[in-house]
């Protein structure tokens, strides 16, 4: 008696398990054995065998399945011949028997038939040692399911070395160590299961009681309407174009399914998925520009159509639960798809081409998008690609393409919720993405605008929401433009390359966060702020290799500008062309720019300018006009080709302290205009190619304090003070290693 547990992975990657048991009776001349096999009866899928087709007026499917068989086999064997006359200890045995395997599931035929085999065995071979064995075997079996099967086998048994020489076994002892003979496999079979109803995988609708429409259908629009609620209508293009002068009006829950397309259907019982196709794809043409070719209803679906002409290819009003999928819509007088009212449904994988080109119309127009999905669509050569007439308050608009449209790729009036992500807009006549009103919420992320004739992304204002991970590439105007105030929200991780300006802000910045954005190789400014910054955070942005300034600011009176980097720009790294009267400007870096590293082109009257670095710039590290207040502290200018800190106009107030100017080719600190007030203290000028400090004049109603500064190893004077003296601090300024005037 014996038992085994078997595990098998089939060619379809299904795992099966079985237990087997048996017994055998052996003598010198005879063999008799019986085996039984009990597998797991669980059905496994074979998707490659799934099939779907029309049966009567229904679409049905049969699921491919694989099952293991239970069964038994037996055989009787006899010694046929020995070979005493040869030098080999050998025998020849023959076996006959049969097998029976079955599974009671529908469609699985029993597997039964005869089996015969023969074995030639050689024992105790001199070159392999006592206990060795070589067996040559052949087997043949036949059944109606698998047909004729033949196998051959060669086995070699070699004894392992032990203590001393092994002894030869007797003939009966050798029989007791024969391998157990059983079916080592788990018997499997694959069939298609019974017919079952099918559902459209896309919507879950059962595909039954079909109505068929083709070019020969009389009064097809009435036939379509009469099919009723939740009906399925199959359009077949085998007989040519289906023309309509009145349009097809959907019932609630009705499905219009086009032939000639392969769609996924799901078995109602098995859950298996099969591909279904029928006939040819139809072209449904609206012959009048005053009618909509299809008018949708709630829960209705249209799949796979080629729709041409009409006023709108598809129209709907206040729809929910609908599906528009894999249609091609072209040549509509107005819009490919036009949906009025509040819209919540699914619009996926459609193509809109050449719609609305004689007017300002669109591939897809939605009035209010409140939920659902608009994804995977392509809109090209229309007036506008995608047009949201009023508001996006929910849902997802993702992975759509707008290209070669006459005007904007995406026109969005306003956005208060939902997400717009992963879309591409390129080669359009106006903007890639245009927002007509303030963005107050939602997520706008990972979109691409490239090679558009105007702006890549053209926003109005931003009061909330997130704009992140978008790319503006090679657009004729600014990559990102904001034409109203920024009061809130987050603008982060966006990239602008090879545009006019990279990022353009036309109005005030009062709040929000602008962080981690990159502007590179744009024709003009990397970041251009045309009006006031009075709040919010602008941080960790990068401007490299732009044709004009890396960062161009106007007035700055509040908020934080920190940890930004400007490198290799054509003019200034960072420039303020308006007054700095408040806020914090800190931790910024400007290196290798073609003019000044950081330029303040108007009055500094307040705020804090601290811990910034300007190095390796072609002109000054820091360039200031008049200083009337504020704090300029702990900044560093090093290795610039002119002055480290250049003060071009009167200093009458404020604090300039703890700054470092080293290794610049001009003065460390250059005060060309009168110093009339303020505090200049604890600064260090070292290793500059001219004097450490150049002061043209302490003059006016002088209240200046010039104290505890240091000048070290400058090529000319440590302190070059031409006229006058500060109100306080003379004698506190020190230095060493300068050509002269180490102390002041």
Q: Residues of each region from the PLM?
A:
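Flexible, glycine-rich linker and terminal segments associated
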Residues: 40-95, 101-108, 113-115, 121-217, ...
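N-terminal extracellular ligand-recognition/capping segment immediately after the signal peptide
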Residues: 230-271
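Right-handed parallel beta-helix
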Residues: 297-383, 387-394, 403, 411, ...
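Glycine-rich beta-solenoid repeat tracts in large extracellular/virion proteins
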Residues: 247-250, 274, 289-296, 312-318, ...
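All-beta strand scaffolds that present successive hydrophobic residues in beta-strands
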Residues: 256-257, 301-303, 321-325, 344-348, ...
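Acidic Gly/Asp/Thr-rich repetitive segments characteristic of extracellular carbohydrate-active
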Residues: 208-242
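Right-handed parallel beta-helix/beta-spiral solenoid domain characteristic of secreted/periplasmic
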Residues: 256-311, 356
């Amino acid at each position: 008696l014996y038992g085994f547990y078997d595990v098998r992975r089939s060619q379809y990657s299904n795992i099966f398990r079985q237990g087997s048991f048996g017994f055998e009776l052996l003598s010198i001349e005879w063999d008799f054995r019986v085996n039984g096999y009990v597998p797991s009866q669980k059905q496994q899928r074979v998707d490659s065998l799934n099939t779907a087709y029309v049966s009567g007026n229904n679409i049905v499917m049969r699921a491919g399945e694989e099952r293991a068989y239970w069964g038994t086999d037996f055989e009787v064997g006899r010694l046929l011949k020995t070979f005493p006359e040869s030098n080999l200890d050998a025998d020849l045995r023959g076996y006959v028997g049969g097998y029976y395997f079955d599974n009671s599931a529908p469609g699985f035929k029993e597997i039964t038939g005869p089996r015969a085999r023969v074995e030639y065995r050689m024992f105790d071979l001199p070159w392999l040692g006592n206990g060795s064995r070589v067996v040559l075997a052949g087997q043949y079996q036949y059944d109606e399911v698998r047909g004729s099967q033949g196998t051959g086998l060669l086995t070699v048994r070699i004894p392992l070395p032990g203590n001393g020489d092994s002894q030869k076994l007797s003939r009966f002892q050798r029989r007791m160590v024969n391998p157990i003979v059983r079916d080592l496999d788990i018997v499997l079979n694959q069939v298609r299961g019974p017919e079952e109803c099918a559902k459209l995988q896309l919507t879950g609708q059962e595909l039954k009681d079909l109505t068929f429409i083709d070019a020969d259908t009389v009064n097809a629009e009435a036939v379509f309407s009469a099919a009723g609620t939740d009906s399925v209508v199959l359009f077949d293009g085998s007989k040519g174009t289906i023309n309509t002068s009145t349009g097809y009006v959907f019932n609630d829950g009705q499905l219009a399914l086009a032939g000639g397309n392969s769609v996924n259907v799901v078995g109602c019982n098995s859950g298996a998925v099969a591909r279904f196709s029928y006939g040819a794809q139809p072209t449904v043409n609206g012959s009048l520009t005053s009618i909509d070719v299809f008018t949708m209803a709630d829960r209705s679906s249209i799949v796979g159509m080629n729709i041409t002409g009409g006023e709108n290819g598809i129209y709907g009003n206040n729809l929910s639960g609908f599906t528009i999928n894999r249609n091609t819509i072209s040549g509509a007088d107005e819009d490919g798809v036009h949906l009025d009212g509040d819209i919540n449904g699914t619009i996926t994988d459609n193509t809109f081409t050449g719609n609305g080109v004689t007017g300002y119309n669109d591939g897809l127009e939605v009035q209010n998008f409140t939920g659902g999905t608009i994804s995977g669509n392509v809109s090209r050569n229309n007036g506008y690609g995608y047009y949201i007439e009023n508001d996006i308050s929910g849902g997802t608009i993702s992975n759509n393409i707008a290209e070669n449209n006459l005007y904007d790729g995406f026109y969005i009036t306003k956005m208060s919720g939902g997400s717009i992500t992963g879309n591409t807009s390129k080669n359009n006549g106006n903007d890639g993405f245009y927002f007509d009103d303030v963005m107050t919420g939602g997520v706008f992320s990972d979109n691409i605008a490239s090679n558009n004739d105007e702006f890549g992304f053209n926003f109005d204002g931003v009061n909330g929401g997130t704009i992140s991970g978008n790319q503006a590439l090679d657009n004729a105007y600014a990559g990102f433009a904001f034409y109203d105030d920024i009061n809130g929200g987050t603008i982060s991780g966006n990239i602008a390359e090879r545009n006019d300006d990279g990022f353009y802000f036309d109005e005030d910045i009062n709040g929000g966060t602008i962080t981690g954005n990159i502007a590179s190789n744009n024709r003009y400014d990397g970041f251009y702020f045309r009006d006031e910054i009075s709040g919010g955070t602008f941080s960790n942005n990068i401007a490299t290799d732009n044709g004009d300034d890396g960062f161009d600011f106007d007035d700055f009176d509040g908020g934080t500008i920190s940890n930004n980097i400007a490198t290799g720009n054509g003019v200034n790294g960072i420039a303020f062309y308006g007054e700095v009267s408040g806020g914090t400007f800190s931790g910024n870096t400007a290196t290798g720019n073609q003019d000044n590293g950081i330029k303040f082109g108007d009055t500094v009257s307040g705020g804090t300018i601290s811990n910034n670095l300007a190095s390796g710039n072609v002109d000054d590290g820091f360039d200031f006009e008049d200083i009337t207040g504020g704090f300029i502290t702990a900044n560093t200018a090093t290795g610039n080709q002119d002055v480290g800190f250049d003060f071009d106009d009167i200093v009458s107030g404020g604090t300039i302290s703890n700054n470092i100017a080293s290794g610049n080719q001009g003065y460390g600190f250059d005060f060309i205009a009168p110093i009339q007030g303020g505090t200049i203290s604890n600064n260090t000028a070292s290793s500059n190619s001219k004097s450490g400090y150049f002061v043209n004049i302490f003059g006016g109603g002088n209240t200046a304090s010039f104290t505890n500064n240091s000048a070290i190893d400058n090529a000319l004077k440590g302190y070059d003070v031409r006229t006058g003296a500060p109100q306080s601090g003379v004698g506190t300024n020190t230095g060493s290693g300068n050509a002269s005037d180490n102390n002041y």
